[in-house]
UniProtKB/Swiss-Prot annotation:
Family classification: Belongs to the PyrK family.
One Gene Ontology MF term: flavin adenine dinucleotide binding
This protein's UniProt keywords: 2Fe-2S, Electron transport, FAD, Flavoprotein, Iron, Iron-sulfur, Metal-binding, Pyrimidine biosynthesis, Transport
Quaternary structure note: Heterotetramer of 2 PyrK and 2 PyrD type B subunits.
Summary of the function given for this chain in its UniProt record: Responsible for channeling the electrons from the oxidation of dihydroorotate from the FMN redox center in the PyrD type B subunit to the ultimate electron acceptor NAD(+).
Metabolic or biological pathway, per its Swiss-Prot or TrEMBL entry: Pyrimidine metabolism; UMP biosynthesis via de novo pathway; orotate from (S)-dihydroorotate (NAD(+) route): step 1/1
Name used for this protein in its record: Dihydroorotate dehydrogenase B (NAD(+)), electron transfer subunit
The species this protein was found in: Bacillus mycoides (strain KBAB4) (Bacillus weihenstephanensis)
Required cofactor(s): [2Fe-2S] cluster; FAD
GO biological process: one example: 'de novo' UMP biosynthetic process
Length: 259
């Protein structure tokens, strides 16, 4: 159930180049039950920036009432958020959207989790949930270069983990699909989050497989009211049918929406 709460900053640190790990504490964490959901953050106490920023939920610790977000500080809003200090309050709206269907993976099956860049974080909570129900997980994490690689060790604690960098400075040189080809990786179910180019490449290969993708999209309201994040449905060539990434997604079955 969506709620709004001023949450306490427990810790914030830069874990890779311009990539920040922010831990917040508050009762809102008890509502965070579906990996792949996101929160809408008011990055500053004043009216500037006006719009909230959508950030995915990376890790949930309901015993401590804490959750972790990872984000890239690149625009005015996220750079402002990166300045928030321990003990300060952050206005959080969430959890929002529909997450990854953990129930679609069965114990004993193999799940392939593919993340690209800042699409990697929501896969961490998902992986933990899958492992807890006896699913074997394989992770492929794609980044531009070594300086922006993060959470490789944390994913490796949960299952086989491969890293690809476009420039070859760490792991396999190339894209996540190059890792799949190089190691002959197969799976029963696929979960993915990342840039559209990566999602399109996966859809081209696995449209007939059991697979779910999470879209990264700019949002205004985060609750389906402003229609800033609509995406069209593949089943309607006329383009009249659509879904909203913030409220209907961000996770969709592969092949459902136009990428």
């Amino acid at each position: 159930m969506m709620q709004k709460q001023n949450m306490i900053v427990v810790n914030q640190k830069e874990i890779a180049k311009n990539i920040y790990e922010l831990v917040l504490q508050g009762d809102l964490v008890q509502q965070m039950n579906d990996p792949g959901q996101f929160v809408h953050i008011k990055v500053a106490e004043g009216i500037t920036p006006l719009l909230r920023r959508p950030i995915s939920i990376c890790n949930v610790d309901q015993d401590k009432n804490e959750f972790t977000m990872l984000y890239r500080a690149e625009g005015q809003g996220t750079k402002t958020l990166a300045k928030r200090k321990q003990g300060e309050l952050v206005d959080v709206l969430g959890p929002l959207g529909h997450g990854f269907p953990v129930e679609e993976a069965e114990s004993g099956q193999t799940a392939l989790l593919v993340g690209g860049g800042i699409g990697v974080p929501p896969l961490y909570e998902l992986s933990q949930r899958l492992v807890a129900k006896g699913v074997r997980v394989i992770h492929i994490l794609g980044f531009q270069t070594k300086d922006v690689v993060f959470y490789e060790e944390k994913f490796a604690e949960l299952g086989d983990t491969y890293v690809a960098t476009v420039d070859g400075t760490h792991g396999t040189k190339g894209f996540v699909t190059d890792v799949i080809d190089s190691y002959g990786i197969d799976f029963d179910i696929l979960y993915s989050c990342g840039p559209l180019a990566m999602l399109r490449a996966l859809e081209g290969r696995y449209k007939e497989r059991k697979a779910y993708i999470s879209l990264e999209e700019r949002m205004g309201c985060g609750i389906g009211a402003c229609f800033a994040c609509v995406c069209h449905l593949q089943a309607d060539p006329s383009g009249h049918s659509y879904k909203k990434v913030c409220s209907d997604g961000p996770v969709f079955p592969i092949g459902e929406v136009v990428l």
